[in-house]
Amino acid sequence: MSDVQALRIDRLSSADPSQVARWEAFVMACPAATFFHRAGWQTVLREVFGHATYFLYAHQNGEIQGVLPLGEIRSRLFGHSLTSLPFAVYGGVAASNDEARDALEAHAQQLARTLGAEHLELRHTEQRHPDWPAQDLYVTFRKEIAPKEEDNLLAIPRKQRAMVRKGIKLGLTSAIDATVDRFFALYADNVHRHGTPAFPKRYFQALRDTFGADCEVLTVSSAEGQPLSSVLSFYFRDEVLPYYAGDDEAARDLAANDFKYWELMRRACARGLKVFDYGRSKVGTGPYAFKKNWGFEPKPLHYEFCLYQREAIPQNNPNNAKYRLLIQAWKRMPLPMANWLGPFIVRNLG
């Protein structure tokens, strides 16, 4: 009689340390997994935003063979969705074999129907379902970090390298912050100038509390000590991912933005990290051009959808023409009011 058990799908309980430890061990070892597959996102989504989470894992004979973190968003403004993963650039299934991968996706589709979701979205880095509707708006930028600091500097194209050297010449400095205070002030002001709502400060504090040393804030200051530019980054295995950033209006003239990313790369090199993940950008935008100018090549992201109660993929992004008037109005709103109102909107964008 065989002792082989059937593959099972279960839901992660964040209250069970042994389950969390097994999940985390699998994610750290699975080549297909990313920082956004980590178990801590379940806590962040629930405690900061109040969203229901379904962190599914496939296991057999006591071994996890795949994970699929899902978050459910119910919004009168933006609809009802089940996504892997809200507020993340990557997601979908991370599995060690096709059986686990297929079983998790099938379970997610059934779960979405049971919940009455309008759509299921899986944010894949590789195409999984050519026959599913897909969002082709986003690309990611990743590049290897050379072992030597000077080689990384020389790998930056001439124009942007000159900006880095300008920042150095102007006496800009960088420091790792113990709090999110300076970062949030720069971030909130920055997104307000662009006409988009800001996440609440407690979200960034929750990221720091949840992920510890794997979530770090680096802030660049002028020679006189004025904070100019800041970035909150994630560390995963041998990679660094600058994820949220903010700049003072004076940062551009002082080359603080280029200097900031150089300092992050330089420090990552010193730590022996291998990959600089510049993150997601929309095709044709300023951030897209900025990363290209740094010598990074875009790679398409495959955000694939199952549509249940809608006919087309939702376009809840600033490129949507129907949001242009709202963006202009948001820019004119006083910053304290925008910081108060923003979290009520952004929690549902995902």
Model-derived segments and spans:
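Active-site/acyl-donor-binding loops of N-acyltransferases
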Residues: 2-6, 72, 126-151, 273-274, ...
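A conserved beta-strand-loop-helix scaffold within acyl/acetyltransferase catalytic domains
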Residues: 6-61, 68-78, 124-253
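Aromatic (often tryptophan-rich) hydrophobic motifs at membrane interfaces
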Residues: 56-68, 75-77, 88, 96-111, ...
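Acyl/amide activation-and-transfer machinery of modular secondary-metabolite enzymes
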Residues: 84-92, 136-143
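Short intrinsically disordered coil segments
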Residues: 85, 154-163, 317-324
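Non-catalytic accessory segments adjacent to catalytic cores
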Residues: 99-140
